[in-house]
Structures are given as structure tokens and as C-alpha cells.
């Protein structure tokens, strides 16, 4: 869990509609593969960046854990 100031930061940087590319996801069950792009659908109060991926999946990114960048 990240602190409230970091959640505010993540919400200020990643806005609904922003495009994201995934470089590394730490999900042992169903990670998003390297280079997959998607669109941010929102950031929740825990700082999870929710993404609708171009491959049809919806899965959140964890700031500071998963590797990703704006396109």
C-alpha cells in the first residue's frame, strides 16, 4: 500500500484516457506481456492504475512495482 501523498501524485500524473505501454508486470498468474499498450480508465484510492489493454484485457498497474510508461 502506498501513502496518501503518493496516491495524489499518481492521480495527478495518470489521467483517464492516457496511453500506457507495459514493460514488466509482477503478476504470476496472468501478466500483461512486454510492449502491450492500453488506455488508462482511472486511478483508485489505493493508487492502482486501471487500464483497458489493447488485447481486450482489463488489469491494473501498481506504481513502483510494475514497469510501464506513457506512450
Label the predicted regions.
Residues 2-11, 15-71:
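Basic/aromatic-rich interaction segments and small domains that mediate binding to polyanionic partners
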Amino acid at each position: 500500500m502506498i501513502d496518501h501523498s503518493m496516491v495524489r501524485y499518481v492521480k495527478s500524473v495518470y489521467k483517464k484516457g492516457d496511453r500506457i505501454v507495459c514493460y514488466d508486470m509482477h503478476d504470476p498468474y496472468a501478466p500483461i506481456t512486454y510492449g502491450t499498450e492500453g488506455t488508462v480508465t482511472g486511478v483508485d484510492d489505493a493508487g492502482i492504475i486501471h487500464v483497458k489493454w489493447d488485447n481486450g484485457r482489463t488489469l491494473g498497474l501498481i506504481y513502483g512495482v510494475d514497469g510501464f510508461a506513457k506512450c
